Regions:
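Active-site beta-loop-alpha junctions enriched in small/polar residues
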Residues: 34-36, 61-63, 79-81, 106-108, ...
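Short coil/turn linker and secondary-structure boundary residues
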Residues: 8-12, 89, 111, 140-143
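Conserved Radical SAM active-site core
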Residues: 1-73
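Residue-level signal for the start and early helices of compact helical domains
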Residues: 2-4, 20, 27, 69-71, ...
Length: 176
C-alpha cells in the first residue's frame, strides 16, 4: 500500500476541476489511482469537461475495459506472471491501444519479460509505446535495469518497436 488509508480527500467533479484550474500554464493531466475506471461514469464526465482545455492521460491497471472513444491517451498496465494478477488482464485492451498510448510492463523476472514479449508478438496493438519498468521490493529493483536493458537488446521481436524504460524515481528514493 503506497499511502495510508486516511490520506487524500474525497471530492466531487466540480471540486476536482476547481483544483485543476488553479495550476496556471498546465496543459496536461494524468488521472491515476487506485483504479480510475472503477468510477467510470464520473471519470467520463470529468474527461468530457476537461478535454477541451487539457491533454488527458489515464493510467489503468489493465483489468477494466478502456474506452477508446474517449479523447484521452491511455497508459495500460499489463500484470505479468510474478504479480499473480496476469489472469485478470483484459486482453482486448491491448488490441485497441494506439500510437498515443502506452502499454506498461512491470518486470520482476525473466518470465515476466517473456510474458511481455509474447503479448507484443501477438500483435498487441497499433504501434503503442511499450514501457518496461523494473519491479521493486524493499526499496530495490528486483531486476537490475542493466539486465532488463540487455534482455530488450537481445530480443529480436522488439527490434523496431517503440520501447522505453520506465524508471519510477520515487521508488529509487524509497518515497511511497
Amino acid at each position: 500500500q503506497a499511502q495510508s488509508p486516511d490520506s487524500g480527500k474525497e471530492m466531487n467533479i466540480d471540486e476536482i476541476i476547481n483544483e485543476v484550474v488553479k495550476f496556471k500554464n498546465c496543459y496536461r493531466i494524468t488521472i491515476t489511482g487506485g483504479e480510475p475506471l472503477l468510477q467510470e461514469a464520473e471519470l467520463e464526465e470529468l474527461v468530457n469537461r476537461l478535454s477541451m482545455e487539457y491533454d488527458i492521460s489515464i493510467e489503468t491497471n489493465g483489468a477494466h475495459p478502456i474506452k477508446k472513444s474517449w479523447p484521452v491517451s491511455w497508459v495500460v498496465d499489463y500484470k505479468c506472471s510474478s504479480s499473480g494478477m496476469k489472469k485478470k488482464m483484459l486482453l482486448k485492451n491491448y488490441k485497441v491501444v494506439g500510437t498515443h498510448d502506452i502499454i506498461k510492463f512491470v518486470i520482476g523476472d525473466k518470465q515476466d519479460f517473456e510474458d511481455a514479449v509474447y503479448l507484443i508478438s501477438r500483435g498487441a496493438s497499433i504501434d503503442p509505446v511499450y514501457a518496461f519498468s523494473p519491479m521493486f521490493k524493499d526499496g530495490k529493483p528486483v531486476v537490475e535495469i542493466n539486465e532488463l536493458l540487455k534482455w530488450i537488446e537481445e530480443e529480436e521481436a522488439l527490434e523496431y518497436l517503440r520501447i522505453v524504460i520506465n524508471v519510477q524515481i520515487h521508488k529509487f528514493l524509497n518515497i511511497a
